């Protein structure tokens, strides 16, 4: 049996853009993706601190400091909103007991603090 556990999160990132006319996804600074141990095209949940929205999408690589919600997800955020970007992993209970998720805290410019 496997359970779904928090794999990593990018905590309190600032939305820099919302592009309704793009096909879909969230564009994330490539360096933040690496620091969080996430992968391009990985499914993630987006938690908007400002309005309480919670939704799923997938990652595409972006430029330094970029956090952009694309397509339909652009309707769920406003530029300047703070979001938490969360990934999960499936693992056995034994693996989960020793697993530590990666937490990446960022400043207002979406630069990693760690």
Swiss-Prot record:
Q: What is its EC number?
A: 4.1.1.11
UniProt keywords (A-Z) are: Autocatalytic cleavage, Cytoplasm, Decarboxylase, Lyase, Pantothenate biosynthesis, Pyruvate, Schiff base, Zymogen
What reaction gets catalysed by this protein?
L-aspartate + H(+) = beta-alanine + CO2
Binding sites annotated in the UniProt record for substrate: 57, 71-73
Keyword Lyase part of the UniProt annotation: yes
Its pathway is: Cofactor biosynthesis; (R)-pantothenate biosynthesis; beta-alanine from L-aspartate: step 1/1
- Please give the Gene3D superfamilies that the UniProt record associates with this protein: 2.40.40.20
Cofactor annotation remark: Binds 1 pyruvoyl group covalently per subunit.
Where in or outside the cell is it found?
Answer: Cytoplasm
Q: Which family does it belong to?
A: Belongs to the PanD family.
Q: What is this protein called?
A: Aspartate 1-decarboxylase
């Amino acid at each position: 049996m496997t359970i779904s556990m928090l794999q990593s999160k990018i905590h309190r990132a600032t939305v820099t853009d919302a592009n309704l006319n793009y096909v879909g996804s969230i564009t994330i600074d490539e360096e933040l993706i690496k620091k969080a141990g996430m992968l391009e095209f990985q499914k993630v949940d987006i938690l908007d601190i400002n309005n309480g929205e919670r939704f799923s999408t997938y990652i595409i690589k972006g430029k330094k400091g970029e956090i952009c919600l694309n397509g339909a997800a652009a309707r769920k955020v406003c530029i300047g909103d703070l979001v938490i970007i969360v990934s999960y992993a499936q693992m056995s209970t034994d693996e989960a007991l020793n697993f530590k998720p990666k937490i990446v805290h960022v400043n207002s410019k979406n630069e990693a603090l760690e």
